[in-house]
Amino acid sequence: MTKILFVCHGNICRSPAAEFVMKELVRIAGLETEFVIASAATSDEELGNPVYPPMRRVLKEHGIDCAGKTARQLRRSDYEEYDLLIGMDEENMWNMRRKFHGDVAGKLKNLLDYAGREGEAVADPWFTRDFAQTWDDVLEGCERLLEALSGTVIVDFTACAEISELYGELRRKLRYESWVGDNLDALYDVLTGLPHRGTRFVLRMPLDDAPTEVRLYAGRIHRVFADAGY
């Protein structure tokens, strides 16, 4: 079991968003029993407060419920309790290193490092007011974190309304070369022989109100994954 603690300044925007996004990804992947996930603040400014309403609304728009979450402060004992303590920016990282007198076990990580955005900060909506950008950053970081820890890549077709959007999601998640064509034969080649990301794939199919041709084509994509051994 892997224990993850997400950390930001106040524990009312970014770190609770990461906590509940990661919990949702783990649920979709069927890996709930393999992870313990929580979040905390480096400061004491918001202790006991719920998730900030605009952040809570964005989570709700994506079907994620964070009811009952209140801010709590990082404790020295967290370093022993958790396997990974993941900050949202360099200030969080500095505060954690100070709290724990360094990082002797190599447990302190920056979330967007997992997405190949080394040293970048998750946008802080308390200042930017751009909660959608924070969602995007958190989702990207958590998806790549799940991949790094479990080899699982979630291919999410639920928002796709056109066949081209299905391939857009495939390109984002598998990260195969741009010269590969957008067709089922090319997808099979990627899955069976060409470099791509992930060792286990979870496909989320289009919603019932998606166009019929999109739902049918997504079914064909699902069969290609099965034929390729995934």
Name each model-derived stretch:
Residues 27-34, 100-104, 230:
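Short helix-capping segments at alpha-helix termini
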Residues 84, 90-150:
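Phosphate-binding/catalytic loops
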